[in-house]
Amino acid sequence: MTKEMQTLALAPVGNLESYIRAANTWPMLTAEEEKELAEKLHYQGDLEAAKTLILSHLRFVVHVARNYAGYGLPQADLIQEGNIGLMKAVRRFNPEVGVRLVSFAVHWIKAEIHEYVLRNWRIVKVATTKAQRKLFFNLRKTKQRLGWFNQDEVEMVARELGVSSKDVREMESRMAAQDMTFDMSADDDASDSQPMAPVLYLQDKTSNFADGIEEDNWEDQAANKLTFAMEGLDERSQDIIRARWLDEDNKSTLQELADRYGVSAERVRQLEKNAMKKLRAAIEA
């Protein structure tokens, strides 16, 4: 991967709203334009052609990344990983196969995002309260199975989760509202610069959702392991992990941390990756 292509992959580290707006300004290619550019890259190694192919598909990566919003991971990071998958797809795309790039690239984009989620999900799971995890993901899983609830399904879900029908409707509305916010165009007043984490749907402190949740000793042990593992990191790595993963109210972007430490965003990403690797090893030990 060239330095220019790496720069493209790290594009969402700044303001997410501005990035999405910029991604949507790049015109989509016709089948003929796409084939011509792909041939230049495939047969001549034309990097300008590769750049155009990538830029014209950035909006598609944003679309794919939105499907992973429920994992509590920063949207900018999901998009960044998806962009890496897009670049791998562009590099491997054979224009003679007879399919559009978007059909070929979707598998690479999802593969990179899947790997990122699997690498980081356990840390997020430990760092979020048990009540938030159980409530959000149980309801989200049920919605994936049933879609938008009718009244009978609302009552069934309420029985399954041990809550009232009113609570189910309220949570469903919050989840739908957050999805609508992400769907808004860059020209709308609403800002989608904040990552869509489970805590955003669960900040109503009057909710009685947590009343019937069972104790989970493994999670308590994992939380203790995380605390112990954090103490083994250097001060800068601790700060990066806290700012990126543990501060639910004000998560920092890679660029913000890069400015704080006077290094590149790529360097912060490397430090974060190394720290996360150490934390995972400690939790899984």
UniProtKB/Swiss-Prot annotation:
InterPro entries: RNA_pol_sigma-70_dom, RNA_pol_sigma70, RNA_pol_sigma70_r1_2, RNA_pol_sigma70_r2, RNA_pol_sigma70_r4, RNA_pol_sigma_r2, RNA_pol_sigma_r3/r4-like, RNA_pol_sigma_RpoH_proteobac. Keywords: Cytoplasm, DNA-binding, Sigma factor, Stress response, Transcription, Transcription regulation. A motif (Interaction with polymerase core subunit RpoC) lies at residues 77-80. Residues 254-273 bind DNA. Residues 53-122 are annotated as: Sigma-70 factor domain-2. It holds the Pfam family Sigma70_r2. One of its GO terms (molecular function) is DNA binding. SUPFAM superfamilies: Sigma2 domain of RNA polymerase sigma factors, Sigma3 and sigma4 domains of RNA polymerase sigma factors. It is found in: Cytoplasm. GO terms for biological process: DNA-templated transcription initiation; response to heat. GO terms for cellular component: cytoplasm. Its main location: cytoplasm. The keyword Cytoplasm applies. Residues 229-281 are annotated as: Sigma-70 factor domain-4. Belongs to the sigma-70 factor family. RpoH subfamily. Interacts with the RNA polymerase core enzyme. Sigma factors are initiation factors that promote the attachment of RNA polymerase to specific initiation sites and are then released. This sigma factor is involved in regulation of expression of heat shock genes. This is RNA polymerase sigma factor RpoH. The lineage of its organism: Bacteria, Pseudomonadati, Pseudomonadota, Gammaproteobacteria, Enterobacterales. The gene is rpoH.
